[in-house]
């Protein structure tokens, strides 16, 4: 049993990284706290595990998210105190199938080396998107992604992350928590796009081209809608830079609220989390040299914004030259794909004296 002295919590990403780091055996199997394994779960996952592979088991879930090809929808309860244990165990045996798909989600099993080689979860992500980031790094590195229907668990579905009864439309507390989580998730999504240039959950490798945005005029509110697609953002004045920096001062407030961090708690704990250096991203003036430069000068952005999520795909076929996307100019000197530089994450070192191992 491992406990900690860091108030109020270690955090999801760090917690799982420590789980793997401190594991004494070569194979690690991870379950979330709102999951119940089926009979012979260990035998089932070990029979499907391969080298250089992340193996997910299949989730059996109550009908809260709708049907999907990765899960089995069957209601055995949404409250652990009312869980139909015997019925689930009987059903779980009949639900097992000798088939696999390519998908990644908890619960998962893997060789410890596979996890350690990419650095585990990126502590940049505090409330969501850490799985998608880890999956993208596995794909970039060539790790096999596999989900088996031979092993399954019952998943109470987001009770851990969203709270008990998060789905209850009559609970004001639950609705408020979901709203706060949604706002936190939007911040995490912007962090993901800033890192990878776009978002997906492992459907394909992402290309992260090195790009500079030159913003000559326009509102801060408009700029904030898309500047996270770029590695550096060049601004006309220090005043505008200061305004952008001020927008990010509350980035962690929603995660802190959900995780019950006080301001003092966060000041003590933030040293253990990766964070974005916005002072390096936001620059005043224009770049002297660049690989790809996007210039925006008081133009209509409708066409550009509708196509920005496809910008990496557009650039994939582009030769050096000048292009237009709507009224926006795109200058391509070189195409430098930074995706491979994101594969291995380095998290700040953790103070192991904060842990008690029994």
Regions found by a protein language model. Give the residues of each.
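Active-site-adjacent helix/loop segment of glycosyltransferases
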Residues: 63, 69, 136-212
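Active-site acidic Asp-centered loop
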Residues: 31-34, 104, 122, 295
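Short aromatic/hydrophobic "clamp" motif used to bind/position activated sugar donors
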Residues: 28
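Conserved donor NDP-sugar-binding/catalytic core segment of glycosyltransferases
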Residues: 35-79
């Amino acid at each position: 049993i491992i406990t900690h002295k860091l108030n109020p919590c270690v955090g999801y990403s760090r917690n799982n990284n420590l789980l793997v780091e401190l594991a004494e055996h070569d194979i690690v199997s991870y379950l979330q706290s709102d999951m119940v394994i089926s009979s012979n779960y260990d035998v089932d996952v070990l029979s499907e595990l391969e080298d250089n592979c992340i193996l997910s088991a299949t989730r059996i879930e109550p009908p809260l998210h709708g049907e999907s090809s990765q899960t089995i929808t069957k209601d055995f309860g949404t409250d652990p105190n009312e869980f139909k244990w015997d019925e689930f165990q009987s059903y779980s045996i009949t639900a097992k199938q000798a088939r696999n798909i390519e998908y990644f989600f908890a619960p998962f099993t893997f060789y410890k080396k596979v996890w350690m080689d990419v650095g585990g979860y990126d502590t940049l992500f505090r409330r969501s998107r850490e799985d998608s980031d880890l999956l993208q790094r596995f794909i970039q590195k060539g790790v096999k992604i596999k989900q088996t229907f031979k092993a399954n668990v019952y998943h109470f579905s987001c009770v851990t992350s969203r709270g008990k009864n998060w789905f209850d439309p009559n609970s004001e507390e639950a609705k408020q928590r979901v709203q706060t989580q949604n706002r936190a998730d939007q911040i995490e999504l912007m962090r993901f796009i800033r890192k990878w240039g776009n978002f997906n959950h492992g459907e394909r490798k992402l290309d992260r081209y090195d790009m500079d945005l030159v913003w000559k005029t326009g509102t801060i509110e408009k700029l904030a809608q898309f500047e996270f697609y770029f590695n550096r953002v060049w601004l006309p004045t220090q005043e505008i830079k200061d305004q952008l920096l001020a927008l990010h001062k509350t980035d962690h407030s929603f995660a802190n609220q959900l995780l019950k961090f006080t301001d003092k708690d966060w000041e003590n704990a933030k040293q253990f989390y990766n964070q974005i250096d916005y002072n390096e991203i936001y620059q005043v003036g224009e770049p002297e040299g660049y690989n790809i430069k996007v210039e925006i000068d008081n133009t209509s952005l409708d066409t550009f914004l509708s196509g920005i999520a496809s910008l990496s795909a557009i650039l994939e076929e582009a030769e050096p030259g000048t292009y237009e996307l709507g009224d926006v100019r795109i200058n391509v000197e070189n195409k430098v794909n930074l995706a491979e530089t994101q594969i291995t994450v380095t998290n700040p070192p953790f103070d192991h004296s904060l842990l008690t191992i029994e």
